[in-house]
A protein has these predicted regions:
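Outer-membrane beta-barrel proteins
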Residues: 1-171
């Protein structure tokens, strides 16, 4: 839905698991999977701002994995949530800057035992990125820095940091 400078959107999907529950093994006995996304975007002149929220439950009945072991999207038990925001500003026709922050949360599905209650199954993967681009005639210079805390939903992994500068010339 778009009106003037504001845009909203939603998406939802649920897939029914049609496995016969009486003959299914514990490994194949999965729930229905579901995913949802909602977003909003506002732009006015040189400024644009956007936010989104998403949810994914792949329907896996496996027990949660501890926060220090890493997770794989769509194969881990539990569910994933994401909150993201971005802001971009065109300083002039030649220069633009933007910032993005994303927080992905893995919420484990632990077994209901005393030992499981003492284990942390939740972990946030946080991404912060800043970008800048400048162009003049046939030349462009682009740079960004991105930092990812707890990559691959693993609380023991070191924070990743990437910085890149690119220069382009057109002849």
């Amino acid at each position: 839905i778009k009106y003037d400078a504001v845009q909203f959107g939603v998406y939802g999907n649920e897939v029914e698991n049609t496995t016969d529950k009486l003959t299914a093994t514990a490994a194949s006995n999965e729930r229905d999977s579901s995913e949802y996304v909602a977003y909003a975007k506002y732009s006015m002149g040189p400024l644009a701002f956007g936010v989104s929220r998403s949810y994914l439950d792949a329907g896996k009945n496996t027990a949660g994995t501890a926060a220090n072991l890493g997770q794989t999207l769509r194969t881990a038990g539990g569910y994933f949530e994401n909150d993201q925001m971005s802001v971009a500003y065109n300083v002039n026709d030649a220069l633009s800057v933007s910032y993005t922050r994303s927080v992905d949360t893995y919420n484990g599905a632990p077994a209901r035992t005393v030992a499981a209650a003492m284990t942390d199954y939740n972990v946030d993967t946080t991404t912060n990125a800043i970008q800048a681009a400048y162009s003049m005639g046939a030349m462009s210079i682009k740079a960004y820095n991105m930092q990812v805390k707890n990559p691959q939903y693993d609380s023991d992994k070191e924070t990743l940091s990437v910085t890149e500068i690119a220069v382009g010339l057109a002849f």
